[in-house]
């Protein structure tokens, strides 16, 4: 079985080798764990953002950033492009931000390959029938501070590896790398909704691709949390190749999948978050989805699509100003 940790290790090693070129910093902790600062005390880079995103996806996806990417003729933003031939494992078995790390004063959302060793959350791995038994643990952290030895020890223990084999990559939401990796979740937003909200067997998704604009750096972590979510919810476009069976209603799936099917659709995410008293669990799960979904049913040959980009919301979210 493919190992998301072993597939990601060469990418991590390449980042370490090219740290100066990528504007990142490599920190060796006293217990032997390795921290890659991709945006806390450094600037990061587009290349670091691509590598970080690819690691989040367990090394099982191609990731590109196109500065010429457009949401529409009205609005030009750089875009992240993702394609994978292992969508369930790459997005849900690795990329899903399913591990909350809360140790002392350190807090982060954890995603990436190490989740497959710790099996967090366990139900996800049972659904996709996947496990990893590598002796190295690579965890991507969305955080505004760097982890210490205690955090590394915690990860090592949960993953069943020696702490010297732990790699922790860190990028704040309000950093270039952080913004890129969140937009890089465009495909995962769809597979997550398929599994968690629509209870569709994601193992039937055989190939997937997606593109989403990258939010510019417009403010602090809270402002960027809103903007980065909006990039996918109102600008993300996805394509799923599905091997259905006779009982699947692919057209109904396609209509239910995009963010426009949610009751919270139509306003910047930060407004929705504030209305929910800053509680993610009060927000409709169906909101976390790409704007556009295209499904190719490989069994029937059908090609269906639903949803569209919402440029006006993107402009409002970013405070986009067209100069005259």
UniProtKB/Swiss-Prot annotation:
Enzyme Commission identifier(s)? 3.5.4.27
Q: What is its pathway? A: One-carbon metabolism; methanogenesis from CO(2); 5,10-methenyl-5,6,7,8-tetrahydromethanopterin from CO(2): step 3/3
Taken from the UniProt record, the cysteine pairs bridged by disulfide bonds within this chain are none
Provide the alphabetized UniProt keywords.
Cytoplasm, Hydrolase, Methanogenesis, One-carbon metabolism
Molecular function (GO) terms for this protein are:
methenyltetrahydromethanopterin cyclohydrolase activity
Q: Does the keyword Metal-binding apply?
A: no
Class in the EC hierarchy, top level: hydrolase
Q: Which family does it belong to?
A: Belongs to the MCH family.
- Any idea what this protein is called? Methenyltetrahydromethanopterin cyclohydrolase
Organism classification: Archaea, Methanobacteriati, Methanobacteriota, Methanomada group, Methanococci
Gene symbol here is: mch
């Amino acid at each position: 079985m493919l190992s998301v940790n072993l597939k990601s290790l060469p990418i991590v090693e390449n980042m370490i080798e090219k740290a100066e070129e990528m504007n990142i910093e490599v920190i060796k902790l006293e217990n032997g764990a390795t921290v890659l600062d991709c945006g806390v005390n450094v600037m990061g880079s587009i290349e670091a953002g691509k590598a970080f995103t690819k690691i989040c996806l367990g090394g099982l996806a191609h990731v590109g950033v196109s500065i010429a990417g457009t949401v529409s003729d009205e609005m030009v933003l750089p875009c992240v492009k993702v394609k994978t031939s292992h969508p369930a494992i790459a997005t849900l078995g690795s990329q899903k931000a399913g591990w909350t790390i809360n140790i002392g004063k350190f807090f982060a959302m954890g995603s990436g390959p190490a989740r497959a060793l710790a099996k967090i959350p366990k139900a996800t791995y049972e659904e996709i029938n996947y496990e990893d038994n590598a002796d190295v643990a690579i965890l991507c952290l969305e955080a505004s501070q760097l982890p210490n030895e205690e955090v590394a020890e915690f990860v090592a223990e949960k993953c069943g590896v020696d702490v010297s084999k732990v790699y922790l990559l860190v990028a704040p939401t309000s950093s270039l790398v952080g913004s890129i990796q969140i937009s890089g979740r465009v495909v995962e937003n769809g597979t997550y909704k398929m599994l968690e909200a629509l209870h569709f067997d994601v193992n039937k998704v055989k190939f997937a691709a997606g593109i989403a604009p990258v939010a510019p750096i417009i403010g602090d972590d809270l402002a960027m949390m809103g903007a980065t979510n909006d990039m996918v919810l109102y600008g993300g476009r996805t394509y799923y190749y599905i091997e259905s069976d006779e009982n699947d209603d692919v057209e109904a799936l396609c209509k239910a999948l995009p963010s426009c099917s949610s009751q919270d659709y139509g306003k910047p995410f930060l407004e929705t978050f504030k209305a929910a008293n800053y509680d993610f669990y009060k927000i409709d799960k169906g909101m976390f989805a790409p704007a556009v979904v295209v499904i190719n049913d490989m069994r029937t040959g059908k090609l269906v699509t639903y949803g569209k980009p919402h440029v006006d919301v993107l402009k409002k979210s970013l405070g986009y100003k067209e100069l005259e």
